[in-house]
A protein has these predicted regions:
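A residue-level marker of the well-folded mature domains of exported/periplasmic proteins
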Residues: 1-205
Length: 205
């Protein structure tokens, strides 16, 4: 919203604006003439497909419900939201195709905008964590909260911020990994911290 006045002024002056990456949700109509970005919803779907391949057997073997954490740094950025929703909707689609019930809980934006109808006693719970402020500390705490839930089998991070927070949140708990009794960690983007975490097995990918 802070940019909207400037965008309107640029439009009125005939200055074309091209956005990159996240886009500008709520921008004055016609002020942003194009946006160069990943199809973030499709990217989230692809992440879900690859993740579900790894989780499928664990879900089948679980006697009770299983929880898949979804970490987003915010509920306002177009790229973050769509990567999260793409992941949520595709996991739900795949799980439902295998005969499981699915629900979404946590952040209201994701619960309301996902294609999943909330239901009680679901086999697969998609638990969305978004911090009140975008800080590494709060996101690491979100990760720890998810890791400390007994039914969590996976956590997905929708960008580098969330991925690095997963690594930090795991430091004392040491629950992330690819073993049957560990929590699978998958994330978007890369950087030194995430690359090293994939290399040493903390993150699956």
């Amino acid at each position: 919203d802070a940019c909207n006045d400037a965008l309107q002024q640029a439009k009125d002056a005939g200055i074309p604006i091209v956005g990159f990456d996240s886009g500008v949700p709520g921008a004055p109509e016609g002020s942003v003439v194009a946006n160069a970005a990943t199809d973030n919803y499709a990217a989230g779907e692809l992440a879900a497909e690859k993740t579900y391949e790894v989780l499928k057997d664990r879900i089948a073997k679980a006697k009770d419900s299983v929880r898949i954490g979804v970490m987003g740094q915010d509920a306002t950025s177009e790229s973050i939201i769509n990567r999260g929703l793409g992941f949520i909707d595709k996991i739900a689609e795949l799980a439902e195709a295998d005969g499981y019930t699915v629900t979404v809980e946590g952040n209201d934006k994701y619960v309301q905008d996902s294609k999943v109808e909330p239901t009680d006693d679901a086999k697969v719970i998609l638990d969305v964590a978004v911090p009140s402020q975008v800080t590494a500390e709060l996101s690491a705490t979100d990760c720890q909260t998810l890791l400390n839930k007994d039914d969590t089998i996976c956590i997905y991070g929708s960008n580098q911020h969330s991925g690095e927070a997963m690594v930090t949140g795991n430091e004392n708990l040491q629950k992330l990994g690819s073993g049957e009794d560990q929590v699978l960690g998958v994330t978007f983007d890369s950087g030194t911290v995430i690359k090293e975490a994939v290399k040493n097995g903390t993150l699956y990918g």
